[in-house]
Design a protein with these regions (language model features):
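Intrinsic low-complexity/IDR segments
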Residues: 1-39, 43-44, 48-49, 53-84, ...
């Protein structure tokens, strides 16, 4: 860790200001890579385009600072004051922001790939078009934040408060949103494929993600059961049906049409049993029904007859 005195830091900031104001003609870009700046008072500092990757920023005051387009990758931001800071376009790749205060900060277009944001104050933060892929946001308060167009693939958002957040057109593929509060959130246009939304609160949320099976009418479906048999089902017109964020669907009743092996051939078996409940039988010609069907579509693994619209999907499951 590179130690920096207050005098050295002031000189670096002065030269950096000249570099910024002259568009790189005068002065020198601030090179604070690996520097120990813990406890420094940098309120309102202009660090646009500076290099601070791997820097130690414990308890640094960066309130109202301009850190746009700054390299902050792998930096340690524990307990840092970043209220109203401008971090637009900044590189925060795998940065540790544990217990920092980012109230009203601007992180639009910032790269937060793999960043740790545990116990961070993120009220009213602007994450518009930010890259938060694989970021750890577990249990954070993101109420009223702007996450429109953000990349949240594989992000950990379990137990997160996203009340009234703008998540429109965001990419949430494979994100973990179990037990999250999404009440009054705007999820219009969001990519929710394979997102885990188990036990999340969607009261008042704006969401237009379609289910993976026909919403009306009867149709043919398939499911894999015990001993790797494929059951062909007729989902009747009056069956309740839903899906969460994958191709797997659920319904409350269906008629068994046929039972075949994985290769599509029949060995004469007319009754097979569920993989998850060996007392639940599927017999050709009979109607099976689940009385305690869970109408919450986001509880993908909950009660119901699980199925796929195509036979190939059932075979591969």
């Amino acid at each position: 860790m590179k130690e920096i005195t207050i005098k050295q830091l002031n000189e670096i900031l002065t030269k950096h200001a000249e570099w910024v104001n002259s568009c790189g003609v005068k002065g020198a870009r601030a090179d604070l890579r690996g520097a120990n700046l813990s406890g420094a008072d940098l309120r309102g500092a202009d660090l646009r385009g500076a290099s601070l990757n791997n820097a130690n920023l414990w308890y640094v005051n960066l309130k109202n600072a301009n850190l746009s387009d700054t390299d902050l990758s792998n930096a340690n931001f524990c307990c840092v004051d970043l209220r109203h800071a401008n971090l637009s376009g900044a590189n925060l790749w795998y940065a540790n922001l544990w217990r920092s205060n980012l109230w009203c900060a601007n992180l639009s277009y910032a790269n937060l790939l793999g960043a740790s944001l545990n116990d961070v104050n993120l009220w009213y933060v602007n994450f518009r078009h930010a890259n938060l892929e694989s970021a750890n946001l577990k249990g954070t308060d993101l109420s009223d934040t702007n996450l429109s167009g953000a990349n949240l693939r594989y992000a950990n958002l379990r137990g997160t408060n996203l009340w009234s957040a703008n998540i429109s057109n965001a990419n949430l593929r494979y994100a973990d949103l179990r037990c999250a509060n999404l009440s009054d959130a705007n999820l219009s246009g969001a990519d929710l494929w394979y997102t885990d939304l188990w036990n999340s609160n969607f009261n008042g949320a704006k969401i237009d993600f379609p289910i993976a099976c026909p919403e009306k009418g009867s149709f043919i479906a398939f499911k894999k059961v015990k001993d790797d048999y494929i059951v062909e089902l007729l989902i009747p017109e009056d069956a309740r049906r839903c899906s969460a964020t994958s191709e797997k669907c659920r319904c409350d009743k269906a008629k068994v049409l046929s039972i075949t092996k994985l290769d599509g051939t029949s060995d004469g078996v007319d009754t097979v049993y569920s993989k998850h409940d060996e007392a639940f039988a599927y017999k050709i010609g009979e109607i099976v029904e689940v009385k305690d069907f869970d109408d919450n579509r986001w509880n993908e693994c909950s009660t119901g007859i699980h199925f796929f619209v195509t036979r190939q999907e059932a075979v591969e499951y």
